[in-house]
């Protein structure tokens, strides 16, 4: 499954994995998964977190290692119900629910994920996605960026 990923995607997922793997031991625990999900405004129960881990925990050790994480991401990318996932992701970024992601909202979510970005980097991310040039990202622009990955 993970064989279909490009080197660039694998590098991106490695970076995402390290955001989850707070103590850097190469495994994501339910506690670490919960921390990241809560920073994104989600509030999963302990049982839901365990289910998420069990879903991809191939060796049954109760944690997710990087190869298991890659398989999960490869599966998610193939998933046909990605429309709903994109809407959900957009809602996470669009804090005030006005239908647009502003630079401030993007910075807020990225900071919660542990990404320390300069104002220039945030502005650059907005510019890359902002097709109509209004300084913020609407849903269509967001989908284009996410699908291009």
From Swiss-Prot:
Ca(2+) 2 binds at residues 57, 59, 61, 63, 68. This protein has four functional calcium-binding sites. Keywords: Acetylation, Calcium, Metal-binding, Methylation, Repeat. Calmodulin mediates the control of a large number of enzymes, ion channels and other proteins by Ca(2+). Among the enzymes to be stimulated by the calmodulin-Ca(2+) complex are a number of protein kinases and phosphatases. Ca(2+) 4 binds at residues 130, 132, 134, 136, 141. The N-terminus is blocked. One of its GO terms (cellular component) is myosin II complex. Ca(2+) 3 binds at residues 94, 96, 98, 105. Belongs to the calmodulin family. Ca(2+) 1 binds at residues 21, 23, 25, 27, 32. The modification N6,N6,N6-trimethyllysine is found at residue 116. This is Calmodulin. InterPro entries: CALM/Myosin/TropC-like, EF-hand-dom_pair, EF_Hand_1_Ca_BS, EF_hand_dom. GO terms for molecular function: calcium ion binding; enzyme regulator activity. Pfam families: EF-hand_7. The modification N-acetylalanine is found at residue 2. It comes from Spinacia oleracea. Residues 8-43, 44-79, 81-116, 117-149 form the EF-hand domain. CDD domains: EFh.
